[in-house]
């Protein structure tokens, strides 16, 4: 009799554990520290084309700097495989603006500060959810002292602007903030 009760107890514990495991598997909560809202069961790749520099003022390393920074952003903050073409998510575009503008005038009637602006046009295609496709223009600027040569501050300012634009693109495409 004791053996029969022991078997029922073990059977009951096994059944309860199986039921709990099934219930918890069905009710999963997904959380990402990067803020992405990617369904990795459906979306596995992102293609990021080179962004050619079509701006009037051309800084030759800019195209490569931006394209690589955007790829690096997706590599570091998602589990997506970054490929050159035909991804589940696809980013294409071009650098449409790279310009300097005097910002403020000093007492000697010369520019005291200069604004450097970077503008990039992006076309996003989501082959899994086409209703999320968009085309959008992104822009960032940095201000520097007009006494400085652009060649002395250009790479530092570009790194800041590229990171800002890459963050905006990332948020609009996979984080949806």
List where the protein language model places each region.
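Compositionally biased, intrinsically disordered linkers/stalks adjacent to structured regions
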Residues: 154-177
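Surface-exposed short loop/turn segments
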Residues: 34, 76-81, 88-133, 141-152, ...
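Second-shell loop/turn segments in exported
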Residues: 52-59, 148-156
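Bacterial N-terminal signal peptides that target proteins for export
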Residues: 2-13
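Bacterial N-terminal signal peptides
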Residues: 12-25
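A structural "domain/chain start" motif
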Residues: 3, 24-68, 72, 79, ...
């Amino acid at each position: 009799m004791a053996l029969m009760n022991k078997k029922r107890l073990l059977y009951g514990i096994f059944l309860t554990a199986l039921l709990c495991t099934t219930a918890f598997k069905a009710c999963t909560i997904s959380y990402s520290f990067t803020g992405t809202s990617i369904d990795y069961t459906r979306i596995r790749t992102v293609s990021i084309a080179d962004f050619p520099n079509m701006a009037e003022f051309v800084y030759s390393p800019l195209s490569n700097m931006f394209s690589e920074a955007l790829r690096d952003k997706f590599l570091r903050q998602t589990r997506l495989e970054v490929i050159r073409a035909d991804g589940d998510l696809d980013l294409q575009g071009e650098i449409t603006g790279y310009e300097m503008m005097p910002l403020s005038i000093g007492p000697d009637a010369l520019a005291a500060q200069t604004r450097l602006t970077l503008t990039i046009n992006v076309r996003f295609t989501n082959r899994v959810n086409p209703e999320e496709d968009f085309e959008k223009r992104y822009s960032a600027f940095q201000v520097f002292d007009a006494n400085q040569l652009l060649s002395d501050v250009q790479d530092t300012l570009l790194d800041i602007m590229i990171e800002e634009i890459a963050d905006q693109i990332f948020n609009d495409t996979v984080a949806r903030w």
